[in-house]
Regions:
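Charged, compositionally biased, marginally structured helical/coil segments
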Residues: 2-166
Length: 166
């Protein structure tokens, strides 16, 4: 599945999601229809979330997909094995993965991204510098759709290592 995502289009548009939703409706696939309706509603909510309407870009749609994925994964973690809600979330996650951009979860790749970003921005690692670190790291981590549940412990470990070295 990961290989498939490499050659597939990187960005998902709201139009593509709506086409898939219409196909699911036509085929009578209620679970797929439910997931797609929910994603489209969340994306449309972002479009009108401020005082003025913003354009629903591919980036916003992808951000919505990644947020929805995280919500499902968190729900799966909270439910015991075999629980009906967990089974439902797992099914929804399988459907979502078809549309969701690849999320960076590999610790080594995330650590490399963190180190490169800090070096490129000439930011020193340290607890007193954490605000500045996060200011440069967050956009880079979000751009790569890095899993923040993996990234934050790496950042905290790097800070503790830097403090113990000094």
């Amino acid at each position: 599945m990961k290989k498939e995502k490499e050659w597939r289009e990187i960005f998902m548009t709201i139009e593509k999601l709506e086409q898939e939703r219409n196909l699911a409706r036509k085929n009578g696939n209620s679970e797929r229809l439910l997931v797609l309706n929910d994603i489209i509603a969340k994306a449309r909510a972002k479009e009108t979330a401020g005082k003025k309407k913003i354009e629903l870009t591919e980036q916003l749609v992808n951000d919505t997909l990644v947020e929805y994925r995280k919500m499902l994964k968190d729900g799966i973690k909270q439910m015991p094995e075999g629980h009906s809600v967990r089974v439902m979330y797992e099914g929804q996650l399988v459907i979502l993965e078809e549309f969701c951009p690849a999320v960076l979860e590999d610790e080594v790749q995330i650590e490399n991204l963190i180190v490169k970003t800090l070096y490129a921005n000439n930011v020193e690692v340290g607890r007193k510098n954490k605000g500045k670190m996060m200011k440069v790291l967050m956009p880079a981590l979000r751009a790569q759709y890095a899993d923040m549940d993996v990234a934050m412990p790496i950042i905290d470990f790097m800070i503790s290592q830097a403090e113990s070295a000094s």
